[in-house]
Amino acid sequence: MSQVVQSRRLRAIDIGKRKAEGRKIIALTAYHAHTAGIVDPYCDFILVGDSLGMVMHGMESTIPVTLEMMILQAQAVIRGTEKALVVVDMPFGSYEASREQAFLNASRVLKETGAGAIKMEGGAHFAETVAFLVQRGVPVMGHIGLTPQAVNTMGGFKVQGRGPDDERRLLEDARAISEAGAFAIVLEGIVEPVARAIASSPRVTAATIGIGASAVCDGQILVLEDMLGLSERTPKFVRQFGSLRTHIEDAVKAYADEVRAGRFPADDHTYG
């Protein structure tokens, strides 16, 4: 008698298992059902990032992004995927005021979207909030280093970890967030020696996910549009694995030329 194998969506605990097994963790951002569906078979988790404010809406930073925007796009990503864990960014102003505020908004995200985890930026000062959420059933991914929501206080998008004080701070941030119960931590814009120290620390049991933090991390994440070559400008740490911007421009130009010349729609595209 044949046995039916029941597939299921990955969970936060599976990310930790990949770290324990030494398997690299693959992640990308997605904001739409169709793009999420394309990347789903290849990713361990998909991040519905607050970067959608800049990528989708042309905002200058992630600061104006609202909880409602995050929920709407996360719902789309869930509908378009079957396999990957879906993680949703908590936007600026949705978790900083108190642990209670963080739980109310995080639980709303999970209930209204069906996502499997939330991500929040911040270091050791948010460890109590992380523990509060985890103890109440909310899987949390941390995010330290270059934290875009703090761009106004950081003085811009600056590489982190240069200097002994910065190194100590980042190590303490990672240890505190991990020990509070985060299942993973995004390390963004961190110099390689510091990223290595974090990833190899016995006190950091959370999976480390790099974005501009070298190959020493347990996994990697990129903004999908950057990786595909759709963005006009990309950071140093991005490798463009495609050049879709050029292909799209060529396709749109060909379409416009065909319409102007009266060649589209042709008989094949016309109802008789």
UniProtKB/Swiss-Prot annotation:
One of its GO terms (molecular function) is 3-methyl-2-oxobutanoate hydroxymethyltransferase activity. It is an enzyme of class 2 (transferase). The gene is panB. Belongs to the PanB family. Pathway: Cofactor biosynthesis; (R)-pantothenate biosynthesis; (R)-pantoate from 3-methyl-2-oxobutanoate: step 1/2. It comes from Methylobacterium radiotolerans (strain ATCC 27329 / DSM 1819 / JCM 2831 / NBRC 15690 / NCIMB 10815 / 0-1). Mg(2+) binds at residues 50, 89, 121. 3-methyl-2-oxobutanoate binds at residues 50-51, 89, 119. Its EC number is 2.1.2.11. This is 3-methyl-2-oxobutanoate hydroxymethyltransferase. It is found in: Cytoplasm. GO terms for biological process: pantothenate biosynthetic process. Binds 1 Mg(2+) ion per subunit.
